[in-house]
C-alpha cells in the first residue's frame, strides 16, 4: 500500500530548474540569502490552492508538519550562527547569483505605501 504522507527525506540534487511557485519573500531574496523548507503537512497528491488542501490545515498532521519545518529552519539558522564559514559560503553564493542576475524592483521609487488606518 502507498503511504499518504511523505515519509522520507529526498536526497539532495543540484539543479538549475526553477520551482514555479509564489512566496512572500520576493524582494527580500534579492537582498540576502533565504531558505525554503518542504515538510509533510497534507496528503500526497492533494492539489495546491484547493478546498481539499485547506481542509487538511486544521489537522494534527498539518500542525506537526509546520512544527517540523519551523524546527528545521531554526536548526539551520543555529548552524549559520555557529559556523561562520557556512554563513560566508551562503553569502558568497548569493552574491555570485545576484551579480550575474541583478534585480530591479518593479515598483517605482516614487510609490510609497499609505499609512495603516
Give the role of each language-model region.
Residues 1-117:
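Metal-dependent amide/peptide-bond hydrolase catalytic core
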Amino acid at each position: 500500500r502507498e503511504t499518504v504522507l511523505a515519509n522520507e527525506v529526498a536526497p539532495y540534487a543540484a539543479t538549475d530548474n526553477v520551482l514555479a511557485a509564489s512566496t512572500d519573500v520576493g524582494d527580500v531574496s534579492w537582498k540576502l540569502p533565504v531558505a525554503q523548507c518542504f515538510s509533510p503537512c497534507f496528503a500526497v497528491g492533494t492539489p495546491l490552492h484547493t478546498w481539499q488542501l485547506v481542509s487538511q490545515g486544521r489537522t494534527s498532521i498539518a500542525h506537526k508538519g509546520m512544527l517540523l519545518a519551523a524546527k528545521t529552519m531554526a536548526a539551520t539558522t543555529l548552524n549559520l550562527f555557529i559556523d561562520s564559514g557556512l554563513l560566508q559560503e551562503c553569502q558568497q553564493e548569493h552574491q555570485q547569483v545576484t551579480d550575474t542576475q541583478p534585480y530591479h524592483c518593479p515598483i517605482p521609487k516614487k510609490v510609497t505605501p499609505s499609512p495603516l488606518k
